[in-house]
């Protein structure tokens, strides 16, 4: 049963989504005004109508909704890349993650959702404005119970020990390799997201210096092509989300 203060997703007849907090107020859309207090006491999957008679379905928010509707600042790590990081590093509930380059907090939200309330994410960020924006998004999504943001430079060292994963979105991830080697548990993953190939080459060169600490690194990227499906034809859409960044994985031994 939905209560006042809960977050819900409202979906209009066109498929447009609204992520709102349930309260005793009116919510204005181009399809009419919704009285949000009518949601209180209902269940997910039910619907309410606007004053113009349009029906809005009530859904439980998922992480994709928070990522779509969060406040944006610097460029985010896209869900396609975040999902790859989670899959290839084997990130699981209860894991302890050190992250750096928090930006708007998109990857932080994704990781916090995966590790769950028993896990922990510590995020290093050197810019106070980015840290403030990310923390607003983290609190809004309800993950402030498992995330800590440090206004510190990870290039100077990692304070945490026995870490499951070190995940970076930084210009010079090679500067963190030595720190990560000390902080990671055996079997943990060092992961770096980098937009440019020269960054990857510098990182691989540094990892070769630490071959006694890390398994042979692997670098991949992923391209996403949405398909346009019609009655008589299916073809890729004319726009596609192609290169966003390279992701390098190196496992601690």
Swiss-Prot record:
GO terms for biological process: tRNA methylation. It comes from the Archaea. Changing residue 78 to Y: Decreases efficiency of the dimethylation reaction. SUPFAM superfamilies: S-adenosyl-L-methionine-dependent methyltransferases (SSF53335). Changing residue 196 to S: Decreases stability of TrmI at extreme temperatures. It catalyses: adenosine(57)/adenosine(58) in tRNA + 2 S-adenosyl-L-methionine = N(1)-methyladenosine(57)/N(1)-methyladenosine(58) in tRNA + 2 S-adenosyl-L-homocysteine + 2 H(+). Contains a large catalytic C-terminal domain that binds S-adenosyl-L-methionine and a smaller N-terminal domain that may play a role in tRNA recognition. Domains are connected by a linker region. This is tRNA (adenine(57)-N(1)/adenine(58)-N(1))-methyltransferase TrmI. It comes from Pyrococcus abyssi (strain GE5 / Orsay). The gene is trmI.
